[in-house]
Swiss-Prot record:
Pfam families: Cyclin_C, Cyclin_N. SMART domains: CYCLIN (SM00385), Cyclin_C (SM01332). One of its GO terms (cellular component) is cyclin-dependent protein kinase holoenzyme complex. GO terms for biological process: cell division; G1/S transition of mitotic cell cycle. The keyword Cell division applies. Transmembrane segments: none annotated. GO terms for molecular function: cyclin-dependent protein serine/threonine kinase regulator activity. This is Putative cyclin-F2-1. InterPro entries: Cyclin (IPR039361), Cyclin-like_dom (IPR013763), Cyclin-like_sf (IPR036915), Cyclin_C-dom (IPR004367), Cyclin_N (IPR006671), Cyclins_cyclin-box (IPR048258). PROSITE patterns: CYCLINS. It comes from Oryza sativa subsp. japonica. Keywords: Cell cycle, Cell division, Cyclin.
Length: 390
């Protein structure tokens, strides 16, 4: 090892703090397994060794190595956060015993501390969300990485009419649940936590029978609208499960008429351990009447599909898939009932973009503002509600 490394490195390895740091970075094998070139680059980057003469491209290579080492720091490997947020490793805290690495300044770009818990992660995201549209409008900012800027020109002739129709339907009071029905209709006999557990159970039911995409969102909408209109004769687990299972059964038939070939009232009764298929059918009739037979209103999944319908390329399709998943999880949040489905859809797309962090992407952009009709400020409150559900 000494024949490979310069004397400066050998001297530093003799120091207790440095030796412990090498062990931390290299794993259980200690310094003997450490990549000497990587260690040498790191020590020079923090000023512990004199710098090598500059060579074309050398700074970028060294910076990449240092970033890789910093990202392996165990002190940042155990974030207790449910948001899989990626923070550039150059912004992470330094290893124990070492000074911070110099971060190249980016014009007008704020530097965020690495989140160390869920609260910090959410605050970092909200700061970036607030800043993203301002940065996107800066003449010196990089061009948006997505293709949304050209989407208005690619839209089908009827897109504007479809969008207007969806927006009108989502604002129709007859198609929306009450945002406070647990208190106003049921006098607190159903808690938000009980509702969340039941929605999760409904999700397992849709997966068990591989029901059509969109079934869960429509079923939860039916469930909330029904409970917004009717008090229950009892608030037992059996009664609530009957309402939830019937909502899934009704929504599944709306989404795909072929559902009747793999799922019927007898199967629902068996899955939910209800008395009989007749109990399910009776609840279905009661639910349809309470909903006024209005079954086709848009939901958050509808708008996620609508806003991402022109997604193309690997990164955009990944954002679309994750946004759908987050939208599914948001159904468990009672607080999301206070927002229009299009706002929830915009919020989950923003969270998905930030979580996956494709190169150059920001949580929001002027193109997304134009496409959805919402600014980052418009969706910020909903974003917080969704993040606190994950």
């Amino acid at each position: 090892m000494d024949s490979i490394m310069e004397p400066y490195v050998a001297d530093l390895l003799a120091d207790d703090i440095t030796a412990s740091m090498v062990e931390l970075l290299s794993g259980d094998g200690g310094a003997a397994q450490m990549d000497v070139g990587v260690l040498d680059a790191y020590l020079r980057a923090i000023g512990a060794l004199p710098a090598h003469p500059a060579a074309p491209g050398a700074d970028l290579a060294a910076a990449a190595e240092v970033e890789s080492m910093a990202s392996n720091d165990d002190t940042n490997g155990n974030w207790d956060t449910k948001v899989d947020a990626k923070v550039p490793s150059a912004f992470l805290p330094p290893p124990p015993g070492f000074p911070p690495l110099p971060v190249p300044a980016l014009a007008d770009e704020p530097v965020y501390a690495a989140p160390v818990d869920e609260g910090d992660a959410i605050r970092a995201f909200m700061q970036q969300l607030e800043w993203s549209e301002q940065y996107n409008g800066d003449d010196d900012a990089p061009a948006p990485d997505d293709s949304m800027a050209s989407r208005p020109q690619l839209c089908a002739p009827y897109d504007d009419d479809i969008d207007a129709n969806l927006r009108a339907m989502e604002k129709d009071a007859a198609e929306r649940p009450s945002p406070d029905y647990l208190d106003t209709v049921h006098n607190g006999q159903i808690s938000a936590a009980s509702r969340a557990s039941l929605v999760a159970w409904m999700g397992r039911l849709t997966h068990r029978y591989e029901l059509a995409a969109g079934t869960l969102h429509r079923a939860v909408s039916y469930f909330d609208r029904f409970l917004s209109a009717r008090a229950l004769p009892s608030y037992t687990e059996h009664q609530l499960s009957l309402v939830g299972a019937t909502a899934v059964y009704t929504a599944a038939k709306y989404e795909d008429q072929g559902t009747v070939f793999k799922l019927d009232a007898r199967e629902i009764a068996s899955y939910g351990e209800f008395a009989s298929a007749q109990e399910v059918l009776a609840m279905e009739r009661e639910m349809m009447a309470a909903l006024g037979y209005r079954l086709g209103g848009p939901n958050a999944e509808t708008f996620v599909e609508h806003f991402t319908r022109y997604s193309k390329g690997k990164e955009e399709l990944r954002v679309q898939r994750l946004a759908r998943h987050i939208a599914d999880r948001s159904l468990e949040s009672y607080g999301c009932l206070g927002y229009l489905p299009s706002v929830v859809a915009a919020a989950v797309i923003s969270i998905a973009r930030w979580t996956l962090n494709p190169p150059g992407a920001l949580p929001w952009s002027s193109e997304l503002h134009e496409l959805t009709g919402y600014s980052s400020q418009d969706i910020s409150s909903c974003v917080l509600t969704v993040l606190n559900t994950q």
